Every structure is written in structure tokens, then in C-alpha cells.
């Protein structure tokens, strides 16, 4: 599971491509072959976050 990612320029959902990168561990070069918009390619290339443990809910610290 990955967090939903939408390109801020064109509005396209690029979560599936991010799933391939993080979960399936495909190379960025292989994933970018199927992405046609330059803005989406740039977002995938520059804003990759490491895989998170999604079973733990974050706690709010209000001080």
C-alpha cells in the first residue's frame, strides 16, 4: 500500500507508478517508460519517499 499521489500540475493520479517503485522495487527507468507527461515524470523522479510501516498509526503530540 502506498499513499495516493496526484500530480499537482496536470492532476493525474500517479499512485500506481509509485506502487511499482516502492513495493515491487522496479527501477525508476523502467517505471518512467510508461509515464508520458513530463510533469508526472519529474514528480516521480524527485519526490520518492521511503516505504513506511503503515500498521502503526501516527500519534499527535499537542503541547
UniProtKB/Swiss-Prot annotation:
Q: What is this protein called?
A: DNA-directed RNA polymerase 7 kDa subunit
EC number(s) from the headed UniProt entry: 2.7.7.6
Using the UniProt record, give the first listed, main subcellular location: virion
What does the entry say induces or represses the expression of this protein?
Expressed in the early phase of the viral replicative cycle.
Q: Which purpose does this protein serve, as stated in its record?
A: Part of the DNA-dependent RNA polymerase which catalyzes the transcription of viral DNA into RNA using the four ribonucleoside triphosphates as substrates. Responsible for the transcription of early, intermediate and late genes. DNA-dependent RNA polymerase associates with the early transcription factor (ETF), itself composed of OPG118 and OPG134, thereby allowing the early genes transcription. Late transcription, and probably also intermediate transcription, require newly synthesized RNA polymerase.
Q: Where in the cell is it found?
A: Virion
Coiled-coil ranges from the UniProt annotation: none
The cross-references to InterPro entries, in alphabetical order and at most eight, read:
RNA_pol_7kDa_chordopoxvir
**Subunit text:** The DNA-dependent RNA polymerase (vRNAP) consists of eight subunits encoded by early viral genes and termed according to their apparent molecular masses Rpo147, Rpo132, Rpo35, Rpo30, Rpo22, Rpo19, Rpo18, and Rpo7. The same holoenzyme, with the addition of the transcription-specificity factor RAP94, is used for early gene expression.
- State which gene encodes it: OPG090
Record's Gene Ontology CC terms?
Answer: DNA-directed RNA polymerase complex; virion component
- Please list the GO terms describing molecular function: DNA binding; DNA-directed RNA polymerase activity
Q: Which UniProt keywords apply?
A: DNA-directed RNA polymerase, Early protein, Nucleotidyltransferase, Transcription, Transferase, Virion
Q: Does the keyword Disulfide bond apply?
A: no
One Pfam family of this protein, by short name?
A: Chordopox_RPO7
Q: What class of enzyme is it?
A: transferase
- So what does this thing catalyse? RNA(n) + a ribonucleoside 5'-triphosphate = RNA(n+1) + diphosphate
Concerning its family, UniProt says: Belongs to the poxviridae DNA-directed RNA polymerase 7 kDa subunit family.
Gene Ontology biological-process annotations: DNA-templated transcription
Can you tell which superkingdom this protein's organism belongs to? Answer: Viruses
Amino acid at each position: 500500500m502506498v499513499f495516493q499521489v496526484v500530480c499537482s500540475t496536470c492532476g493525474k493520479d500517479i499512485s500506481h507508478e509509485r506502487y511499482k517503485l516502492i513495493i515491487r522495487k522496479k527501477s525508476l527507468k523502467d517505471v518512467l517508460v510508461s509515464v508520458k507527461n513530463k510533469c508526472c515524470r519529474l514528480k516521480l523522479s524527485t519526490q520518492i519517499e521511503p516505504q513506511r510501516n503503515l500498521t502503526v498509526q501516527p500519534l499527535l503530540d499537542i503541547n
